[in-house]
C-alpha cells in the first residue's frame, strides 16, 4: 500500500483552502492520534484520506472563489450603426419610446425561479426605485412614428471571448406579453424606496475624460426588471453626457457584459445630434465565469436577424427587449450598443461610429509584436492546405545569450541529404534568417521578465597585435622545460621538439633544456634570453690580486704509480714513518696528504691508490698537485696504471719526476724501464730528454735525498706563490664520516688562510669550521696555502674533488648549497635513459631482459665509496646488470638494510662494519650483508653474486642400465623389479627412465635399491638387485631401466 508524507498532506489541505505549514499539520495529526513526528513522516493512503477529511470538518474552510478564466486588457473598437439605419432622433415621440422601452410585463406565464428571486434580493434597493408611470406610456403607445427597439445586441463585431454556452443548465424563462397601455404601473414599495445617490463623474480606465449624464425625465422600469441588478455604484461605470456619440466613451471592463438602464430622474430622451441617451447608465462588459446558461451574452449578427438568440438572452437576463418586441411596436427601430435608434435619413455625420464594444483578448505572458510578412516572403507560402502549403520546413532552436536574459533563434534544420545547413553564403531564393524568425515565432525579441536589461555597447572587434621587440625577452636562470619554453614564447611544444631534433637533441615536453640551447631556439623566433639566475660569484668575496701580497708556498707533490710498486713505502722513507705496514692487504686504498719538512723546505705529499678502481682519485690528485712523482718498479717495468698516471699528469699539465724504485732487487733493469718510458714521451735527461729520473730504494732508503732535491729544484722553477691574506679557497682531497666527530673533510688550502670559525661551503654541503687537525694529528687554528688539514663542522660528507670556499656568513653558504642542490635535482630529472638496440636484443633473447643485482654501498671515506661504486658498475654485462641504489659513508645502519630490503638487494661494506641493529634487521628481512677490506675481494664477491642470479646449466650424465627379469609385490612398497645390471652402475636416488619396446614409458626417481634384502648405495655391472620406482608399479619383465643424474654448472657472465 502506498503512503503519503506529512508535507504532501499539507499540500492537499492547501488545495482545499486550508493554509497550514508542515509543523501545524504535524500538530493536527498528532492531536488526531496519528504517530507523526516531522514533515517526512508517512501515513497510509486510507489514514491520510481520513485525516484530511477530519481536518476539513474541523477547520470548515471557506468556499474558494471561482477562478477568473480571462484576465486581460480591453481593446475597444468604434462601430457604426447598421446598414440602412439613420441617426435616431430622440425628439420624435420621446414619450412613446420611453414607454415602450420600460413597460413592465403584465402577464407572466410563470413565476420567476428561486435563483432569480435570490438574485433580485441581492440587488441594492436603490436599483429598484422607480417613479410612478403617468400618462406617458399611454401617449407613447399611440405614437406610430416610434417602434419598440428590438431586443438585439449592438451591431458590432463579435467579442473574441464569449461566455461558454453550456456552463450550467438553462433555467426556465418567463414569457412576457406586450404591456397593456391602460394598466398603469404602480407599486407601494417603489414609492417607499429611498432615492439612489446621485451619480457623479467616475474616472474612466482607458484614460479618456470622465463624463456625467445630464439630468432628464426618468425612464420608468419594472420592479422585477433584471436590468437593475447592475445599477449599484460598484457595478456602474460612468455617465457620459458630453460625448457626441457613443463611440467617444470608454468603459472599464471587469465583468463580461454591457448593461444599461435609465438613471434616476432621466427622461429617457435622446438629444438630437448626440450619440447616446442623456439619462442612461452603462455598466461594464463582464468577462467572468457564467453562473448559468441564462447569462450568455446576446450578440447582434451582421445578417440583421432579430433572432431568438438575441431576444432570448435579453429576456432571461434583463427582461428588456422582450417587452418591447411583444408590444406590437414597429420593428424598424435598431439597437446599437443597447440604445434604441430611430431610422432616419442618412447623414454625413451618421457615418461616424455610434457605439463602443469591448473585446476581451487573452493576455500573453510577454508582450509581442506581430510582424506582417513581406510580399516576397508571403508568396513562398501558399495558403492552400497540404504538405506544400508551408514550403520548406525549417527548425529553430532557442539559444539564450551570455547574460541569460535574451533569446536567439538558431536555424538547426537540415538539407535533404541529412547534413546540417551551412551557415552563411548567398541564397537568392531563400528569405533572410530574421524573416524566418519573425514568421515562425511572430516576435523579434523575447526578453525575460523582471529587471530590464540595460543596453550594452557593442564591443570593438578583437585586434591581433604583435609584441614589441623589446618585450621579447625570456628571463632564464639555469634551464627550462620544453613545455614552459613554448608557453613563454607562444609556440607549440611540438614545434620546439622539432627544433631540438634538428639540433640533434631528443627531448620530451617535460625535459629540461640548458640556457645555451634555449638561446639557439629563441633566436629563431625572434626572442632574446636574459640570464638572471642565481650566481654563486655574487655571494663569494671579491679579491683584488696584488703582487705585493704574494708569498711563496710549499709545493704539492703527488706520488703516483702502479699498485705494489712501492709508493707508500717511498713516502714512509721520506716521512720516516711506517704507514704501509698498517694498510689492509699492503695496498693503499685512500688518498693521503702529508706535510714533510726537509732541509730545502716544506713539501706536501699526496699519496694516491694504485689500483685500477681508484682512477678518479688519481685524477683528482693530478689536478690539485704541482709536481708528480711517478714511481716505477725497476724489476716490473711500465704497467697499465703507470701508463694511466702518465696520462693524468699530462692532462693536468704538471711536470713529472720519475723514481725508479726497487733498485736493490736482483732483477732490476732500469734501462728497460727507461726505454719503456721513452715510448710514452718520457725521455730521461741522459738520453737528451727533459724528464728527471732518480734511482731509489724505499726499503734501503737509497736516493731519497737526491729525489727531494730534484723536487725542490722543480718547485723553484715553477715559482709557486699565493696570497695568504685573502679568504681561503681549497680542494677537498677526501671525505669521511667519523662516528665521534661526524663529517670530516681533508682539505688542501690553495689560496688564502683557512681559520677556525670561518663559514665555508663546498658542493651541496656547508657549515662553520669548528676544529682542524694537521697531518700529524695536532690541532691547529689556521692553515696556510700549500698545507692540508682535516676540517670538522660541515653539514655532510663532502665529495672528493669539490672546491671549498670561505664566504661572509653561514646564511650565504646555505643559499649557495641549496641552489647547487636544486640544480643537481633538475639535472637528474632531465636525464632520459634510452635503451640501445643491443640492450633491446638482449632483453628479448633473455626473455624479459637481463637480471638485476641491486646493491647499497657503504665505505669509510667518500673517495673509497666512489671508487667502489665505479668498480661495481663496470661489472655489468648483458646477462646481469648491477644497479647501485645508494652510496654512503660510515657504518652500515638499519636504514641501509631497510632500503636494500625494499629493493631486494644486498648491502656492501668497504672498510666498515654493520651496527648491531643492522645485523638483526638483516636477519629479519632476509638481506645479505657483506663486508670487505680489500677492493679485490669486494669485486670478486660482487661477481659471484651476479653469477648466482643466473639459472644454472643442467646437464644429464648416464650412470647405467638394468634389465627387469622378474617383479615382486611388497606391501607398503609396491612393485619391486628384480633386475640385472647390464652396463655402468646403478646408484641409489638416481633418476630413472623406464623403456619398453624402445619407447619411454615413465621417467621419475628411484625409490629404493636393495641387494639380498640389504639397502645398498650402488650396484655395479653384472650384479642383480631390486629396484623400486616412486609412484610407478606397472613393471614387466623385459623392461629396461636407465639410471642417470643431472649436473648443474654455473653460467658465465659473458
From Swiss-Prot:
Q: Specify the domain of life of the species encoding this protein.
A: Bacteria
Write out the biased-composition intervals (Low complexity): 111-213
Q: Where along the chain is GTP bound?
A: 561-568, 607-611, 661-664
Task: Please note every region of biased composition (Basic and acidic residues).
Answer: 401-418
For the region G5, give the residue spans. 697-699
In what residue span(s) does the tr-type G domain sit? 552-721
What GO terms fall under cellular component here? Answer: cytosol
List the residue ranges of the region (G4): 661-664
Q: Which NCBIfam families match?
A: IF-2, small_GTP
Q: Which family does it belong to?
A: Belongs to the TRAFAC class translation factor GTPase superfamily. Classic translation factor GTPase family. IF-2 subfamily.
According to UniProt, the name of this protein is Translation initiation factor IF-2
Native source species: Stigmatella aurantiaca
Amino acid at each position: 500500500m502506498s503512503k503519503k508524507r506529512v508535507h504532501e498532506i499539507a499540500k492537499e489541505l492547501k488545495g482545499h483552502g486550508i493554509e497550514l505549514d508542515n509543523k501545524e499539520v504535524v500538530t493536527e495529526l498528532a492531536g488526531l492520534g496519528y504517530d507523526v513526528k516531522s514533515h517526512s513522516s508517512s501515513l497510509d493512503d486510507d489514514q491520510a484520506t481520513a485525516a484530511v477529511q477530519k481536518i476539513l470538518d474541523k477547520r470548515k474552510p471557506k468556499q474558494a472563489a471561482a477562478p477568473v478564466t480571462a484576465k486581460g486588457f480591453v481593446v475597444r473598437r468604434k462601430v457604426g450603426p447598421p446598414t440602412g439605419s439613420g441617426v435616431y432622433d430622440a425628439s420624435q415621440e420621446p414619450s412613446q419610446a420611453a414607454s415602450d422601452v420600460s413597460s413592465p410585463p403584465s402577464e407572466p406565464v410563470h413565476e420567476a425561479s428561486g435563483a432569480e428571486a435570490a438574485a433580485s434580493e441581492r440587488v441594492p434597493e436603490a436599483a429598484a426605485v422607480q417613479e410612478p408611470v403617468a400618462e406617458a406610456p399611454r401617449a407613447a403607445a399611440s405614437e406610430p412614428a416610434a417602434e419598440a427597439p428590438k431586443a438585439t445586441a449592438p451591431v458590432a463585431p463579435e467579442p473574441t471571448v464569449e461566455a461558454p454556452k453550456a456552463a450550467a443548465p438553462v433555467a426556465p424563462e418567463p414569457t412576457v406579453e406586450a404591456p397593456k397601455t391602460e394598466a398603469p404601473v404602480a407599486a407601494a414599495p417603489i414609492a417607499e424606496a429611498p432615492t439612489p445617490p446621485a451619480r457623479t463623474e467616475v474616472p474612466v480606465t482607458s484614460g479618456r475624460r470622465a463624463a456625467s449624464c445630464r439630468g432628464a425625465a426618468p425612464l420608468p422600469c419594472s420592479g422585477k426588471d433584471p436590468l437593475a441588478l447592475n445599477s449599484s455604484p460598484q457595478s456602474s461605470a460612468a455617465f457620459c453626457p458630453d460625448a457626441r456619440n457613443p463611440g467617444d466613451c470608454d468603459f472599464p471592463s471587469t465583468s463580461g457584459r454591457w448593461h444599461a438602464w435609465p438613471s434616476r430622474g432621466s427622461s429617457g430622451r435622446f438629444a438630437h445630434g448626440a450619440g447616446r441617451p442623456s439619462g442612461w447608465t452603462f455598466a461594464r462588459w463582464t468577462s467572468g465565469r457564467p453562473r448559468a446558461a441564462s447569462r450568455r451574452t446576446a450578440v447582434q449578427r451582421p445578417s440583421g436577424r432579430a433572432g431568438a438568440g438575441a431576444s432570448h438572452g435579453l429576456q432571461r437576463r434583463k427582461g428588456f427587449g422582450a417587452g418591447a418586441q411583444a408590444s406590437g411596436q414597429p420593428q424598424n427601430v435598431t439597437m446599437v450598443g443597447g440604445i434604441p435608434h430611430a431610422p432616419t435619413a442618412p447623414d454625413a455625420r451618421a457615418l461616424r461610429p455610434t457605439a463602443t464594444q469591448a473585446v476581451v483578448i487573452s493576455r500573453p505572458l510577454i508582450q509581442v509584436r506581430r510582424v506582417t510578412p513581406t510580399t516576397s516572403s508571403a508568396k513562398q507560402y501558399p495558403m492552400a492546405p497540404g504538405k506544400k502549403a508551408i514550403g520548406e520546413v525549417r527548425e529553430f532552436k532557442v539559444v539564450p545569450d551570455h547574460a541569460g536574459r535574451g533569446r536567439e533563434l538558431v536555424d538547426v534544420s537540415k538539407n535533404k541529404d541529412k547534413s546540417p545547413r551551412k551557415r552563411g553564403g548567398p541564397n537568392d531564393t531563400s528569405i533572410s534568417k530574421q524573416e524566418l524568425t519573425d514568421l515562425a515565432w511572430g516576435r523579434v525579441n523575447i526578453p525575460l521578465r523582471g529587471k530590464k536589461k540595460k543596453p550594452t555597447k557593442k564591443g570593438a572587434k578583437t585586434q591581433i597585435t604583435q609584441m614589441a621587440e623589446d618585450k621579447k625577452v625570456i628571463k632564464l636562470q639555469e634551464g627550462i622545460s620544453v613545455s614552459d619554453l613554448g608557453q613563454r614564447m607562444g609556440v607549440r611544444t611540438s614545434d620546439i621538439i622539432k627544433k631540438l631534433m634538428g639540433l640533434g637533441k631528443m627531448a620530451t615536453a617535460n625535459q629540461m633544456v640548458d640556457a645555451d640551447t634555449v638561446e639557439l631556439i629563441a633566436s629563431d623566433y625572434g626572442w632574446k634570453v636574459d640570464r638572471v639566475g642565481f650566481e654563486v660569484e655574487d655571494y663569494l668575496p671579491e679579491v683584488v690580486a696584488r703582487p705585493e701580497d704574494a708569498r711563496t708556498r710549499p709545493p704539492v707533490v703527488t706520488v703516483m704509480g702502479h699498485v705494489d710498486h712501492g709508493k707508500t713505502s717511498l713516502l714512509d722513507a721520506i716521512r720516516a714513518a711506517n704507514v704501509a705496514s698498517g694498510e689492509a692487504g699492503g695496498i693503499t686504498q685512500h688518498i693521503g696528504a702529508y706535510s714533510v719538512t726537509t732541509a730545502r723546505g716544506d713539501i706536501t705529499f699526496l699519496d694516491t691508490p694504485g689500483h685500477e678502481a681508484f682512477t678518479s682519485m688519481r685524477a683528482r690528485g693530478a689536478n690539485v698537485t704541482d709536481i708528480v712523482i711517478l714511481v716505477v718498479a725497476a724489476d716490473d717495468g711500465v704497467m697499465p696504471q703507470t701508463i694511466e698516471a702518465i696520462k693524468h699528469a699530462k692532462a693536468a699539465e704538471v711536470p713529472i719526476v720519475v723514481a725508479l724504485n726497487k733498485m736493490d732487487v736482483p732483477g732490476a733493469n732500469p734501462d728497460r724501464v727507461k726505454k719503456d718510458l721513452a715510448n710514452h714521451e718520457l725521455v730521461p735527461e741522459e738520453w737528451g730528454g727533459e724528464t728527471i729520473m732518480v734511482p731509489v730504494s724505499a726499503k734501503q732508503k737509497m736516493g731519497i735525498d737526491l729525489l727531494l732535491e730534484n723536487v725542490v729544484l722543480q718547485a723553484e722553477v715553477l715559482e709557486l706563490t699565493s696570497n695568504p691574506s685573502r679568504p681561503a679557497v681549497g680542494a677537498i682531497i677526501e671525505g669521511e664520516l667519523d662516528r665521534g666527530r661526524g663529517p670530516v673533510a681533508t682539505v688542501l688550502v690553495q689560496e688564502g688562510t683557512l681559520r677556525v670559525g670561518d663559514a665555508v661551503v663546498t658542493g651541496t654541503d656547508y657549515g662553520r669550521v669548528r676544529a682542524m687537525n694537521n697531518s700529524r694529528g695536532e690541532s691547529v687554528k689556521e692553515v696556510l696555502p700549500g698545507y692540508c688539514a682535516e676540517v670538522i663542522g660541515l653539514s655532510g660528507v663532502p665529495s672528493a674533488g669539490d672546491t671549498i670556499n670561505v664566504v661572509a656568513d653561514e646564511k650565504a653558504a646555505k643559499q649557495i648549497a641549496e641552489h647547487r642542490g636544486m640544480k643537481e635535482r633538475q639535472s637528474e630529472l632531465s636525464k632520459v635513459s634510452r635503451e640501445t638496440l643491443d640492450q633491446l636484443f638482449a632483453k628479448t633473447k633473455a626473455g624479459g631482459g637481463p637480471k638485476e643485482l641491486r646493491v647499497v654501498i657503504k665505505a669509510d671515506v667518500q673517495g673509497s665509496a666512489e671508487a667502489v661504486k665505479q668498480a661495481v658498475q663496470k661489472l655489468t654485462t648483458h646477462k646481469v646488470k648491477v644497479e647501485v641504489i645508494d652510496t654512503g659513508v660510515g657504518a652500515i645502519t638499519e636504514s641501509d638494510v631497510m632500503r636494500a630490503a625494499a629493493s631486494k638487494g644486498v648491502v656492501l661494506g668497504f672498510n666498515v662494519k654493520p651496527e648491531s641493529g643492522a645485523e638483526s634487521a638483516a636477519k629479519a628481512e632476509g638481506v645479505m650483508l657483506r663486508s670487505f677490506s680489500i677492493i679485490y675481494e669486494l669485486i670478486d664477491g660482487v661477481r659471484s653474486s651476479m653469477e648466482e642470479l643466473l639459472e644454472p646449466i643442467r646437464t644429464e650424465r648416464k650412470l647405467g642400465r638394468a634389465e627387469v627379469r622378474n617383479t615382486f609385490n611388497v606391501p607398503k612398497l609396491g612393485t619391486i623389479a628384480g633386475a640385472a645390471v647390464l652396463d655402468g652402475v646403478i646408484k641409489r636416488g638416481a633418476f630413472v627412465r623406464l623403456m619398453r619396446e624402445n619407447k619411454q614409458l615413465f621417467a621419475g626417481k628411484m625409490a629404493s635399491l636393495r641387494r639380498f634384502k640389504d639397502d645398498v648405495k650402488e650396484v655395479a655391472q653384472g650384479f642383480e638387485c631390486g629396484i623400486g620406482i616412486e609412484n610407478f608399479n606397472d613393471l614387466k619383465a623385459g623392461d629396461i631401466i636407465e639410471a642417470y643424474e643431472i649436473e648443474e654448472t654455473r653460467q658465465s657472465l659473458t
